[in-house]
């Protein structure tokens, strides 16, 4: 069993001595943004980046920051697969889907009002009735309604698992795309219920999830107290406690790979 002090000591040795010296990074002027940025999101392969603010969005190429397209929106999300696939919440009752940067579908969510969007392998619409409604990117068909007040939605890279975080916990569900495809192809989608058998609850996380990231079937997250944890099936493990800074779990898996390789997940404390 590793104690907290030992975890902190191991992390200090992994990361090397902290000198707090400034890194000599060469800056390059790539231009100025035409709006006040309040949110920045890369697409799934990092080739494009969306800058959003003041109910507008601009999509740039990630390296040269060349303007690709722009528009007005209340919310913006990227697809979990398509390079140029994204969705915008145009109004409280209309969502537009774009395939390869061209408008493809218009979705009118089956809820009194949509209050937000979640990206990933399905389009998630945050309903005004404390729910999240999932829609297919290609067809725009209604997949399923999950009755939880979602704060954030985290999809695994494979798309077969999803974590829905709320204000006081989280729910990890499995997603069966094979059940959705034939129902969509044969037009057997219920406007009220979507497609039965697409989602199943695997387990709950009785903790606040402030940010998170999937690595395979393992969900790693930071809670509101700055504690880094991970879950595998119904088991929850503690990685380490961040003492000085409130950090976010980044999209890069390099840090997570270091933890797994150097410390070893199975050596950590089972909570």
Positions of predicted regions on the chain:
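WD40-like beta-propeller blades
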Residues: 1-271
